From Swiss-Prot:
Statement: the UniProt record of this protein carries the keyword rRNA processing: yes
Record family assignment: Belongs to the class I-like SAM-binding methyltransferase superfamily. RNA methyltransferase RlmE family.
Binding site for S-adenosyl-L-methionine: 60, 62, 80, 96, 121
Species, as recorded: Methylobacillus flagellatus (strain ATCC 51484 / DSM 6875 / VKM B-1610 / KT)
Enzyme class: transferase
Gene it is expressed from: rlmE
Taxonomic lineage from the root: Bacteria, Pseudomonadati, Pseudomonadota, Betaproteobacteria, Nitrosomonadales
Keywords: Cytoplasm, Methyltransferase, rRNA processing, S-adenosyl-L-methionine, Transferase
Gene3D superfamilies: Vaccinia Virus protein VP39
Domain of life according to the entry: Bacteria
Name the UniProt record assigns to this protein: Ribosomal RNA large subunit methyltransferase E
Subcellular location(s) per record: Cytoplasm
Stored InterPro entries: RNA_methyltr_RlmE, RNA_MeTrfase_FtsJ_dom, rRNA-MeTfrase_E, SAM-dependent_MTases_sf
Molecular function (Gene Ontology), one example: rRNA (uridine-2'-O-)-methyltransferase activity
């Protein structure tokens, strides 16, 4: 994981960023919306009638995309420790998805309905120490993968942000154990200097 540029340089880059401008114009809460839009255009992940869980959802741009593409048919359930302002059509559960009480809320909300797609655009708080940040990021991916194994229906799909570096190959191997196919995506909205990519696990294997 690479260091962020200085605050002044980052602010200048942010203000001039094509995807930031598009997000403001299109009403998305973050430029990350265009990452999911591009991946979904390519892989056709989101289909009307689906139940989708968005892990680490705040500020909510991926939930916005998901609910738009469901077109009123299906459900988006978003989870985050942080607060997230309401999004029409999105059910939000605030809390840590590792905790039993939060999972019980999710279970009650699902009411026996299987999850078709898990999406997770999570990143740790950046310390600036590369090895520490990489380990934190890998841990988040492991948590999301564990969640997908538990909650995704057989044949369901899983999309997660990963930072290329130490532990990356192990994450890919772990996903291959759980999904019939694993592919890497680097959408245009991912900054070139960023080591982030998205791993897509297709068709969860039967447990």
């Amino acid at each position: 994981m690479k260091r962020r540029p200085t605050s002044k340089a980052w602010l200048q880059e942010h203000v001039n960023d094509e995807f930031v401008k598009r997000a403001q114009r299109d009403g998305y809460r973050a430029r990350a919306a265009y990452k999911l839009l591009e991946i979904d255009d390519k892989d056709q992940l989101i289909k009307p009638g689906m139940t989708i869980v968005d892990l680490g959802s705040a500020p909510g741009s991926w939930s916005q995309v998901a609910v738009q593409r469901l077109a009123g048919q299906g459900r988006v359930i978003a989870l985050d420790i942080l607060e997230m302002p309401p999004i029409p059509g999105v059910e939000f559960i605030q809390g840590d998805f590792r905790e039993e009480e939060i999972l019980l809320v999710l279970e009650k909300s699902l009411n026996g309905k299987p999850v078709d797609l898990v999406i997770a655009d999570m990143a740790p708080n950046i310390s600036g120490i590369s090895d520490v940040d990489q380990a934190r990021a890998a841990y988040l991916v492991e948590l999301a993968l564990e969640f997908s194994r538990e909650w995704l229906k057989p044949g369901g799909n899983f999309l997660v942000k990963v930072f290329v570096g130490s532990g990356f190959d192990e994450i890919v191997m772990a996903m291959r154990d759980s999904f019939e196919k694993v592919v890497t995506r680097k959408p245009k909205a991912s900054r070139d200097r960023s080591s982030e990519v998205y791993l897509l696990g297709l068709k969860r294997r039967n447990a």
